[in-house]
């Protein structure tokens, strides 16, 4: 299986369980890997034979600006569902990190991996 990757995607999102986290959006950094089956796009040179990474970035940015999440795990799960559902990818790995959230720690976050069968 081939993989599309999106690295160091930064976006502001409403995420957190503490009252102070709910006052304003926080900047997150996402690392995304999307499985694409076979070599159809490489042979056809047609965007319709792959996952359009620009559309994924736009869709994620819209979701992160609009929705609120308590946990990074829930946010990552939601995004994985978009990739496997709307974009029909068979597999996705998403890492979501809060930047500078904990003193002396540059990033803290989660990584999830889902297939079309296991994503919600």
What would you call each of these model-derived segments?
Residues 1-120:
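N-terminal, polar/charged subdomain of small-to-medium soluble alpha/beta proteins
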């Amino acid at each position: 299986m081939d993989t599309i990757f999106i690295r160091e995607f930064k976006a502001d999102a409403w995420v957190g369980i503490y009252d102070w986290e709910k006052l304003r959006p926080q900047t997150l950094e996402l690392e995304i890997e999307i499985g694409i089956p076979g070599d159809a796009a490489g042979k056809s040179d047609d965007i319709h034979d792959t996952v359009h990474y620009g559309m994924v970035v736009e869709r994620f940015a819209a979701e992160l600006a609009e929705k609120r999440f308590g946990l990074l795990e829930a946010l990552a799960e939601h995004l994985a569902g978009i990739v496997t559902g709307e974009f029909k990818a068979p597999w996705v790995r998403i890492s979501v990190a809060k930047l500078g959230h904990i003193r002396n720690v540059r990033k803290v976050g989660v990584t999830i991996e889902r297939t079309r069968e296991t994503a919600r």
